[in-house]
Every structure is written in structure tokens, then in C-alpha cells.
Design a protein with these regions (language model features):
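Short, charged amphipathic recognition helices of the HTH superfamily
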Residues: 1-5
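Globin-like tetrapyrrole-binding proteins
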Residues: 137-140, 150-182, 188, 192, ...
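Retroviral integrase
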Residues: 8-157, 191-194, 202
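Generic detection of long, well-ordered alpha-helical segments
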Residues: 7-15, 171-178
Length: 204
């Protein structure tokens, strides 16, 4: 927030109120996540398109898939019609591959649709290697921590945005809220001083 306020030329004295404003924000406090130690499993892919991490999540009674590039953290959320292999691959084709091309490797948890023969055939057609995440002794995935953390970010921001829209009486579709919250984070989150959008598109 401080970075955006500086871009707007807000007076310095206003920065002292940031913590107070956040602490009294009804939408922020309503969906404040429980603090916990994050568990990441990224393997530091060298370039955009090397490794694409995918996972499914549910919100507002709908099923979505989050796709995130491991190298630059650029992500896309899309509504998923079904959990079978054909539906997952079609979602990938329409929302990722047709814009950025096929990735070299797809990493996911032990999702049935991604493990299916239909999905395997589609991956072979595009020369995509599948990598299934393993689990530790506690049953937690060992290599999908990155995408799971970003799902938390998307869900939290979507819940806040939906509550704000509802209170203001704005007729916004809930699917649009989830998709746009994921998209907006490509322009807001920073890694080593650059946003994911800058890493992929060259600008914000």
C-alpha cells in the first residue's frame, strides 16, 4: 500500500496512518487469515515457461484452476467446468497455452484429472512433462507450496472484494471478481523490485 500511496504523491504524514487504517478496515478484518508458517516448494525455474504450477480451488460455490509460472510468479485464475482431464486441458489451452505457448513442465498435486490418460495424451501432443507432487509424513504436499500460497492470496482478496461490492450494491459477477483479483496481483505483488507483469509483458 505504501508503494501505491507514494506513486499518488500522498503527503508523508499520511503514511503514519497506514497501520491504523488497515486495523479498522471492515473488509480486511472480516477475512483476516490465521498466521502460519508458509510452506514453499519452488525449485527456481530459470525462465518464464519452464515450469507451470497448477491447482484447483473452490470459492463462492464454484470451481477454479490457478495457473502460476514458477519463475516470474505470473498467474491466471479460470473457472473450471469439470475436474476430468479433458476439461482441465481445455482450461489450460484457453487461458494459458494460447497466449504464452506450452510450458516445458506442469507441476501439480495428485489431482485425478491431471493423472488421467486423456491429460497425459494432451501433454504428449505439446511435449509437456508432467510432475506429480509427493507428500511428507503429515500428508502435506512437498512441491506445490507456491501455488497453494497464491490460492490463499486470491481467495482472501476475492472475499474482501465481494463483500465490498455487495455493501456498495454493485452487481458484479463472482467469477469476474476471482479472475480480476488474480489478474490484479500480477501488477501489485513485487519480487526483487519487479512485478510478475513486468517479468512477462515488460511493463505494468
Amino acid at each position: 500500500m505504501e508503494r501505491f500511496l507514494r506513486r499518488l504523491g500522498v503527503p508523508e504524514r499520511c503514511f503514519e496512518l497506514i497501520d491504523t487504517v488497515i486495523a479498522t478496515c471492515e473488509q480486511c478484518n472480516a477475512f483476516k487469515p490465521v498466521p502460519r508458517r508458509p510452506r514453499f516448494g519452488a525449485e527456481l525455474a530459470g525462465h518464464f515457461g519452464d515450469v507451470l504450477m497448477v491447482d484447483l480451488f473452490y470459492i463462492f460455490g464454484m470451481q477454479f484452476m490457478l495457473m502460476i509460472d514458477e519463475a516470474v510468479r505470473y498467474k491466471v485464475a479460470a473457472l473450471l467446468a469439470n475436474k476430468d482431464g479433458k476439461s482441465i486441458m481445455k482450461c489450460l489451452l484457453l487461458n494459458w497455452i494460447r497466449y504464452f505457448g506450452p510450458c516445458k513442465c506442469i507441476t501439480s498435486d495428485q489431482e485425478g484429472g491431471i493423472k488421467s490418460d486423456d491429460f497425459a495424451l494432451a501433454c504428449d501432443r505439446y511435449s509437456i512433462h508432467r510432475k506429480m507432487a509427493g507428500s511428507d509424513d503429515k500428508g502435506q504436499h512437498t512441491t506445490t507450496g507456491l501455488v497453494e500460497r497464491h490460492i490463499q492470496l486470491v481467495k482472501c482478496s476475492s472475499l474482501k472484494c465481494e463483500m465490498q461490492c455487495r455493501q456498495e450494491g454493485l452487481p458484479v459477477d463472482k467469477e469476474d471478481i476471482v479472475v480480476e483479483c488474480a489478474m490484479g496481483q500480477n501488477f501489485q505483488l513485487e519480487y526483487n523490485g519487479y512485478t510478475p507483469a513486468q517479468g512477462v509483458l515488460g511493463h505494468n
